[in-house]
């Protein structure tokens, strides 16, 4: 079983890499690589300055640590460990990302979107209930599935989705996506915890809620 999961993980990463070159949402690079750097005297590409190619090393394309479980004690019982440009500078301009998700029993990654990239899940351990909602063009259709180790599920770019551990043990997922920085908008935080807060009267009317309930939700999320 472990060998099968490793094979599936490798396949997902290869598919994510292949799709990034064909249907990449990030700008297509005009050079082999643009390793991100904090130095500001280089070329600026895709939100980062490029390291001098002559000073690029193997370690610019390497990182470790996805074998370490995330802390699920705080929050809703879910934690993601993201490999981004800060952690892996060689990701810049390549149009891919990878992350580890850890879920405590009953843990939840609340409804959210990734505005700049799609996402694909490979369950390594546990039992997850996942789903996404289509846009108004498709009548806000809800698609859900219960996932087990070895199962793969894809979430289209920009659509609201969620992940919940419905098993009795911890759950682990490896996630890959089609952007080096897909972004993340948690719906509740954005609507009720914006800075500054949205006028409660607007939200009360939009969601058919009592004004005081809106004020309560804003206090919870802000």
Swiss-Prot record:
Q: Which family does it belong to?
A: Belongs to the germin family.
Q: Which residues bind Mn(2+)?
A: 112, 114, 161
Domain (Cupin type-1) spans 64-215
Indicate what this protein is called per its UniProt record.
Answer: Germin-like protein subfamily 1 member 4
> Where is the organism placed in the taxonomic lineage, from the top?
Eukaryota, Viridiplantae, Streptophyta, Embryophyta, Tracheophyta
| PANTHER family for this protein | GERMIN-LIKE PROTEIN SUBFAMILY 3 MEMBER 3
InterPro entries noted in UniProt:
Cupin_1 (IPR006045), Germin (IPR001929), RmlC-like_jellyroll (IPR014710), RmlC_Cupin_sf (IPR011051)
GO MF annotations, alphabetized:
manganese ion binding
Protein localization: Secreted, Extracellular space, Apoplast
Role, per record: May play a role in plant defense. Probably has no oxalate oxidase activity even if the active site is conserved.
Glycan attachment sites: 38, 139
Site positions for Probable non-functional manganese-binding site, renumbered to this chain? Answer: 119
